[in-house]
Amino acid sequence: MMVIRPVERSDVSALMQLASKTGGGLTSLPANEATLSARIERAIKTWQGELPKSEQGYVFVLEDSETGTVAGICAIEVAVGLNDPWYNYRVGTLVHASKELNVYNALPTLFLSNDHTGSSELCTLFLDPDWRKEGNGYLLSKSRFMFMAAFRDKFNDKVVAEMRGVIDEHGYSPFWQSLGKRFFSMDFSRADFLCGTGQKAFIAELMPKHPIYTHFLSQEAQDVIGQVHPQTAPARAVLEKEGFRYRNYIDIFDGGPTLECDIDRVRAIRKSRLVEVAEGQPAQGDFPACLVANENYHHFRVVLARTDPATERLILTAEQLDALKCHAGDRVRLVRLCAEEKTA
């Protein structure tokens, strides 16, 4: 059975394996053992209440409970930009006009922005390609909403998610090649690695501070502004069905879109509810797949189960209860996947 759980120190080798499969561009999952170990340690200290809000971040893994195989990772940053500035570009417009010459030009322009400072961030979502089946992607991505719903007071009112932009299999980014490389004088992969390993001072030192007309970029770079990597398109669709929207903010490195939503308007958070759980044989029928999560902060678990999402008493098997670290009579959080999201 596939189950979401908090990351543990022993997961570092599994995370290294996942990082080696990303193909680049996933800044927060670098193939660097020291960085990943530090990330795990920070997550553990977050759960233990040892860090200020500006440093808090939760990391979860998707595990096969039968074999112990770690198949994916996802994370939440509690409040971005409170220690190091959190940059993106806002895609706006500057108008140049002359009545005398009868000229009017509205020019798309990139403005350096820290507008999302303090927002909670969904990040580090990666599912091993071999496990992209049977609803695992939905479980991995949406499990974070179950955690946020259960422990709402630990998160801020706005949630953002940076989507990976267009990068080819060789690490070539049209947006970086046309813009970032001119200021940073390094390849995309190098900048991505430095950022992912916490060496972010160079961003503030070398970033262009003035607005940039997108018409000055190559056509190839203009075409990928706000577009996602093909492998990231499903993740974007999942978030958009939950209420996230692109509001004209993009990543400073690859031009990928930043999606955002008010936390209390996220579908899975808004519609999830607590029900009592009992042990038994679930009723047969064509029921939809639902997320089921316990309410245990330190031993949080989420699984997928087919059940009636309107039930007041959820029947689960002994195996499902064990995976959730629950007992009969406990209360669990329940919400169905979106109607069009299939798990088979």
UniProtKB/Swiss-Prot annotation:
Keyword Acyltransferase on entry: yes
UniProt: succinyl-CoA binding residues: L125
Catalysed reaction, written as an equation: succinyl-CoA + L-arginine = N(2)-succinyl-L-arginine + CoA + H(+)
InterPro entries hit by this protein: Acyl_CoA_acyltransferase (IPR016181), Arg_succinylTrfase_AstA/AruG (IPR007041), Arginine_N-succinylTrfase (IPR017650)
Annotated catalytic residues: H229
Annotated keywords: Acyltransferase, Arginine metabolism, Transferase
GO MF terms, alphabetically ordered: arginine N-succinyltransferase activity
Pathway info: Amino-acid degradation; L-arginine degradation via AST pathway; L-glutamate and succinate from L-arginine: step 1/5
Gene Ontology biological-process annotations: arginine catabolic process to glutamate; arginine catabolic process to succinate
EC number(s) recorded for this UniProt protein: 2.3.1.109
Pfam families in the cross-refs: AstA
Record's keyword annotation contains Lyase: no
Role of this protein: Catalyzes the transfer of succinyl-CoA to arginine to produce N(2)-succinylarginine.
Family the UniProt entry places it in: Belongs to the arginine N-succinyltransferase family.
Protein name: Arginine N-succinyltransferase
Native species: Escherichia coli (strain 55989 / EAEC)
Lineage: Bacteria, Pseudomonadati, Pseudomonadota, Gammaproteobacteria, Enterobacterales
Gene coding for it: astA
